[in-house]
């Protein structure tokens, strides 16, 4: 593993991806003069990432205010690599214009497809044949920067939001390991993103069909909708809804059943909204 040319490396992220990258870079920085720091935006103070940083004596800061995080990044004055790993903070123009600051970002789609948030949800709902991950440089356009490396995942009817997310995070770390040496030297082969009419910017509030199952869809589309919002026991997305006889219900669970006219058996709950 090559030593880093950077004075500092800041990992800004959440969850297992940020944690695994931090563990790897702790080894890299131990053999160099590079300072490793970690931070999170809107992360639980009791997360595995924050807990590991504290027990490993890696400087860690948790932010819940955009201005405070911007001030923190602005305090860096020497060559710095910022790794945005499963991070929801959008970097403002003054930060992007700093010549000594290099920023890369993990995104959970094959850019330029599905820019923005919950890309895995949209990839499943739109019945893409493949999904994947992209490591890219950060530019002024959201998820529009030059591509460092992409890895694909072939999709089939078994993929749910949760399953795809888990595979993407592991693939994202594997891809990071591939580029780590080049990244430490900032010696990357970059590819400009192709312009695509299919490139849509998804926002956090956006849900397929506003989160309501359309009973007129065919079985495959219904399945894609349900799987795209299936987060298991987590609460990463709101539960999908269904309208039966003019009344809206929350879909708590679903099971394929070809004997049911709807194609599925549902466990339903009262819907308050």
Predicted regions and their residues:
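One-carbon transfer enzymes
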Residues: 1-237, 242-249, 253-272
């Amino acid at each position: 593993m090559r030593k880093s040319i950077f004075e500092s490396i800041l990992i800004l992220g959440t969850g297992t991806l940020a944690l695994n990258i931090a563990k790897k870079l702790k080894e890299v920085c131990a053999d160099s003069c590079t300072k490793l720091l970690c931070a999170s935006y809107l992360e639980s103070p009791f997360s595995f990432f924050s807990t590991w940083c504290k027990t490993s004596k890696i400087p860690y800061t948790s932010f819940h205010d955009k201005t405070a995080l911007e001030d923190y990044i602005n305090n860096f004055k020497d060559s710095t690599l910022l790794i945005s790993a499963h991070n929801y903070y959008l970097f403002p123009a003054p930060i992007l214009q700093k010549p000594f600051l290099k920023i890369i970002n993990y995104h959970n789609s094959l850019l330029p497809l599905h820019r923005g948030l919950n890309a895995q949800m949209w990839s499943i709902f739109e019945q893409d044949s493949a999904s994947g991950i992209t490591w890219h440089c950060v530019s002024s356009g959201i998820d529009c920067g030059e591509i460092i490396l992409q890895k694909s995942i072939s999709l089939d009817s078994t993929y749910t939001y949760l399953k795809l997310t888990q595979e993407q995070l592991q693939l994202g770390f594997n891809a990071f390991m591939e580029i780590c040496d080049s990244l430490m030297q900032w010696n990357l082969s970059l590819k400009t993103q192709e312009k695509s009419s299919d490139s849509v910017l998804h926002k956090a509030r956006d849900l397929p069909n506003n989160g309501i199952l359309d009973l007129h869809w065919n079985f495959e589309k219904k399945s894609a909708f349900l799987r795209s919002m299936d987060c298991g026991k987590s609460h990463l997305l709101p539960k999908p809804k269904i309208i039966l006889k003019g009344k809206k219900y929350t879909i708590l669970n679903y099971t394929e059943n070809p004997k049911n006219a709807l194609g599925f058996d549902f466990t339903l709950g009262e819907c308050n909204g």
